[in-house]
Design a protein with these regions (language model features):
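Compositionally biased, intrinsically disordered low-complexity segments enriched in polar/Pro/Gly
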Residues: 1-18, 251-256
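Small/polar beta-strand repeat architecture
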Residues: 5-8, 16-153
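Generic short beta-strand segments
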Residues: 50-57, 169-173, 200-204, 225
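Extended, low-complexity, turn-rich repeat/linker tracts enriched in Gly/Pro/Ser/Thr and Asp/Glu
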Residues: 58-61, 174-178, 208-209
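Short beta-strand and beta-hairpin "edge-sheet" elements
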Residues: 125-127, 200-253
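Short structured motifs
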Residues: 150-154, 225-228
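Oligomerization/assembly interface segments of phage tail-like spikes and tubes
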Residues: 153-178, 234-250
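Short glycine/proline/serine/threonine-rich loop/turn segments at secondary-structure transition edges
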Residues: 176-192
């Protein structure tokens, strides 16, 4: 079977902004003002697409309960108000629309709670390159006292911790709301929960949209560690953002 080597034109970088995941309980929902109180000093911004779910706080997985009436799991809503100092959040069913009418506070008995999170990875435009490296540490467990033989003995190791690092370079534009601009700000975000990258090695479209079934990618929650900007009269303005995985990456290299 003939094979085709991939080039950089097959790749892409998608991102979820930092500080865009928060939790709240039934007592944090106010009927009448359509307000939910999540954590303070997150990084939710007006226009951000978000989804709601019920999670088990002890595992981080799916929980048992019912979202406040007016909100549906799997539906994309849009932030119309978030006050960092109080954590007050309002959302609408459409970008720039009016607040969703919340008619009850839902049900979520401990350890269950409600979660709001950025809806999906989004394409970062004007990216010129990205790189990602992973490694594993090894712990030396070599022992002495073995019988000598013809050859020198070899050391023995067991697995230690994994780690990784990456970077992405994007050209700056005059679009205030571009994700490349937001990545710079996210470096200094104290609570980076929600930040994540999806690094496509082979992005494939089907029916006019990206098909993750046919594409190949690496995805992970991330911590942004630094950003470097450069401005010269001879080159396009660019920013390089450095990051590391905050958990085990998911490798999807199978087109099925």
């Amino acid at each position: 079977m003939a094979v085709t080597c991939l080039s950089g034109t097959s790749g892409a970088l998608y991102y979820k902004p930092a500080g865009t995941t928060g939790t709240f309980g039934t007592g944090d929902v106010t009927i009448g003002t359509e307000t939910m109180v999540v954590e303070t000093y997150l990084n939710l911004k007006a226009g951000d697409p978000v989804k709601f779910s019920v999670i088990d706080s002890s595992t981080g997985g799916s929980g048992t309960g019912t979202l406040p009436a007016g909100l549906s799991a799997g539906t994309t809503y849009y932030v119309i108000l978030y006050t960092a100092t109080t954590g007050a959040l309002k959302v609408s069913a459409s970008a720039g629309g009016s607040a969703v009418d919340i008619t009850d506070t839902g049900t979520a008995a401990a350890p269950n709670e409600f979660q709001v999170a950025y809806a999906a990875f989004e394409n970062v435009g004007q990216v010129s390159e990205w790189s990602f490296e992973i490694e594993r540490a090894e712990i030396d467990v070599t022992t002495i006292g073995g019988d000598p033989g013809q050859y020198v003995p070899f050391r023995k190791y067991i697995a230690g911790f994994g780690d990784g690092s990456g970077s992405a370079t994007a050209y700056m534009t005059n679009e205030d709301a571009s994700l490349s601009n937001r990545m710079i700000e996210d470096v200094l975000q104290r609570q980076q929960v929600g930040a994540g990258f999806k690094l496509y090695t082979d992005r494939v479209y089907s029916g006019g949209t990206v098909s993750d079934t046919l594409s190949r990618s690496i995805s992970f929650d991330a911590t942004l560690t630094s950003a470097s900007l450069g401005v010269t009269p001879d080159d396009a303005q660019a920013v390089t953002v450095n990051f590391r995985p905050a958990g085990v990456p998911t490798f999807d290299f199978s087109r099925s």
